[in-house]
Amino acid sequence: MAAAALPAWLSLQSRARTLRAFSTAVYSATPVPTPSLPERTPGNERPPRRKALPPRTEKMAVDQDWPSVYPVAAPFKPSAVPLPVRMGYPVKKGVPMAKEGNLELLKIPNFLHLTPVAIKKHCEALKDFCTEWPAALDSDEKCEKHFPIEIDSTDYVSSGPSVRNPRARVVVLRVKLSSLNLDDHAKKKLIKLVGERYCKTTDVLTIKTDRCPLRRQNYDYAVYLLTVLYHESWNTEEWEKSKTEADMEEYIWENSSSERNILETLLQMKAAEKNMEINKEELLGTKEIEEYKKSVVSLKNEEENENSISQYKESVKRLLNVT
């Protein structure tokens, strides 16, 4: 049985060799696709670079609308200004630098947006919103009377690419207290509230606002402060009703102890002279009383000096007929 199986195994092995040889031949005969590589171009045949466009100034017409080119304040643009502008001081003697890439032209402010044509267009556009100046306001006194509040603000021009300045937001409001409807109590209280913002010499109250980032906001805030101060000055607190003469901000002659004492003294002197026809109103209107009043008020409200003391001394002598 083993002898019969041996020839069968040999025949199977020879067939396997024939099949393996056939498959190898078929595989070698079939072409294998290889990945294609991009073809290299020589160095002198590179694709051309993109050409830079010509500046805008070469395409501008002579009769173009210039306010459309520079409508607002902006830094200098060399590609938009058709002028051979040069600026700078070269180290070696020569021609100043051209406008292309010139930093000196960017530093300084320009007024290319404020040409005569642009100003004329602005005026024509604003005519519909403007009215004629009132004919009755023909003097500064009348303007101050009808418009007592004065608003000051400043626009800055600085050397730099930015047209903004943080100090331009500051607003200063000025008004004379005499133009406001205030009585004696309200005026003194308002002066006490504002402190150093009030100038006694010129009678002007100055309010400066710079807390807000915009000028309009600072203007509204200044008007708001003035409104609050005005209404608060008219309020009378309970403790204000109990103020005595020593608590007053300034000495007032009317109904003061000095007025009462001098009236009593003069009435006693007149009674001793048996002259009962003179009353208090006539005594207060005499020249001696007026001089004594001025000297006392000056001595109380102002600093004491030799001049005020001598005036007080002379007024007392004349009042009491003392030589």
Swiss-Prot record:
What are the start and end residues of every segment in region (Disordered)?
Answer: 31-59
Domain of life, per the record? Eukaryota
- Fetch the InterPro entries from UniProt: Ribosomal_mS35_mit, Ribosomal_mS35_mt
Tell me one Pfam family matched here: MRP-S28
Coiled coil ranges:
257-321
Q: GO cellular component annotations, sorted alphabetically?
A: cytosol; mitochondrial inner membrane; mitochondrial small ribosomal subunit; mitochondrion
| Keyword terms, alphabetized | Coiled coil, Mitochondrion, Ribonucleoprotein, Ribosomal protein, Transit peptide
Compartments where located: Mitochondrion
**Gene Ontology process terms (BP):** mitochondrial translation
Per the annotation, which location comes first and is thus the protein's main one?
mitochondrion
Q: Which GO MF terms are attached to this record?
A: RNA binding; structural constituent of ribosome
Q: Per the similarity annotation, which family is this?
A: Belongs to the mitochondrion-specific ribosomal protein mS35 family.
Q: What assembly does the database describe for this protein?
A: Component of the mitochondrial small ribosomal subunit (mt-SSU). Mature mammalian 55S mitochondrial ribosomes consist of a small (28S) and a large (39S) subunit. The 28S small subunit contains a 12S ribosomal RNA (12S mt-rRNA) and 30 different proteins. The 39S large subunit contains a 16S rRNA (16S mt-rRNA), a copy of mitochondrial valine transfer RNA (mt-tRNA(Val)), which plays an integral structural role, and 52 different proteins.
Q: Can you name this protein? A: Small ribosomal subunit protein mS35
> Gene behind this chain?
MRPS35
